[in-house]
Amino acid sequence: MQPGFVGEVVTGLLREHAATAARETGPGPDERVPLSANPQMNDEELMHALVVEDSPQIAERLVELVSVPDRVAVVATAATEDEALAACDRHTIDLAIVDLQLAQGTGFGVIRRLRAATGANPACIVVLTNHAVPALKVAAFEAGADYFLDKSKDFATIPRLVGELLNTKKN
């Protein structure tokens, strides 16, 4: 195989799908480098999502479930309340998937910040937790959550929910 063959194949695929790739090598072996935003996409047409989850494996799966090419872009992931609040300050969020129990802090502060910050175009806030007890459900809705899902049985609901949100946004 020629040394530049893989690069030529990747470049061809990117060109065919009107995509670009970040040029950074990433933080280390086996780390993923995010694709750059498609320059032809109107940013206002994209739904911006935030994933707040302290388990890297679950966060990665949520990014896969929530992302829809040319429709939904995950603009940030956060494992702690502080990281999530910083992401809320940096980005306009249309959809947030929030775990309640985090490595530092809780999802309740994130929910309250999102609810306070989104004003006329409120973010859709989905709580996804392993602790789906009635008291936490009530507290999540009081803080401003729109949906309350149990990780053990509602995980597969997320793509359908994202589809419904996209249909609502389109209308």
Regions found by a protein language model. Give the residues of each.
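Conserved acidic carboxylate
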Residues: 53
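Two-component/phosphorelay signaling modules centered on CheY-like receiver
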Residues: 56-76
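Acidic, metal-coordinating helix/loop segments flanking the phosphotransfer/catalytic sites
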Residues: 77-95
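Acidic catalytic/metal-coordinating carboxylates
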Residues: 80, 106-109
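Active-site residues of response regulator receiver
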Residues: 99-100, 129
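Short amphipathic alpha-helix used as the core "switch/output" element in two-component signaling
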Residues: 108-121
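Alpha4 helix (beta4-alpha4-beta5 surface) of REC/receiver domains from two-component response regulators
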Residues: 109, 132-149, 153, 160
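A short, hydrophobic beta-strand element within the central beta-sheet of small alpha/beta folds
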Residues: 122-132
